[in-house]
Structures are given as C-alpha cells and as structure tokens.
C-alpha cells in the first residue's frame, strides 16, 4: 500500500502565515500560489490552518470583512494530522470522517508535511493507465488503497 509520505508536500514547501494577518492577505497568498490552505502560526508555532472552505463558511458566510478579520478568527484548530506511514486509504477515510480536505503529515509526532484531496487525486491520476486499466489493475489498486 502507498504511504502518504509518497505524495505529501514537504514542510519546507508549505506556506505559513502569522495569526494576525488579514483573511484578504491570506486569500491573496493562496490565490497567487495556487493552493487551498495556509498554516497559521503564533511565534513560529503552528496553531491552525485556514482553508478556502474556512474562508467561505466563516468569513463570507458570516458577513465578515476580509480586511478587518484576522486568519486566527476563521482558522480550523488544531490541524488534524496523520502519520507519514499511513496509507492513501487511511488518509481518505480520515478526511471523510472529519469532513476536511487537508491533513498535516507527521513523523514521530512532528509535522513534516501536508496532503490534500488534490494531492491524492493528482497522485492517482498520474499513475500509468496500463497499471490501472491493464491486466493487473485490480492488484495495483489494492496496493494503493488496501483491501476493503
């Protein structure tokens, strides 16, 4: 089975913002970099995550001002995490259970990366079609997702 560390975004590539920046500024960073979330920090300690869904539900949905509202007020906290050796199936199940699309990835309890639904879809869609559609396709899918 494929562990999430295979397709995670390493921590040094993950974007983090200070808890005091405005939601508008965070949204612009997300738009400009083509990502759906940023981690939120307080004195370089990760205290949460802001996703595009958080912005829709907790800012737009509540009629708040994006320039006057800090990311701390719309973030999800704590970041829900999964061990790097868990499988893509485990990550999918956790995201479904928690109704989220982003997970922190840990090694020995320390955050080492992030994964999103988009990362999982990209990973699976980039597998050679002959692996998925060919004679051994079922075996390959079992290796990726595990047995039901």
Describe each region flagged by the PLM.
Residues 1-13, 51-81, 87-96, 116-148:
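Tandem CBS (Bateman) regulatory domains
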Residues 21-26, 37-42, 56-62:
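Short, functional N-terminal and low-complexity linear motifs
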Residues 45, 101, 110, 131-134, ...:
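Generic detector of intrinsically disordered, low-complexity, polar/charged segments
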Residues 30-33, 38-54, 95, 103-118:
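A glycine-centered beta-loop-beta connector
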Residues 16-34, 81-99, 106-107, 124:
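The conserved cystathionine-beta-synthase
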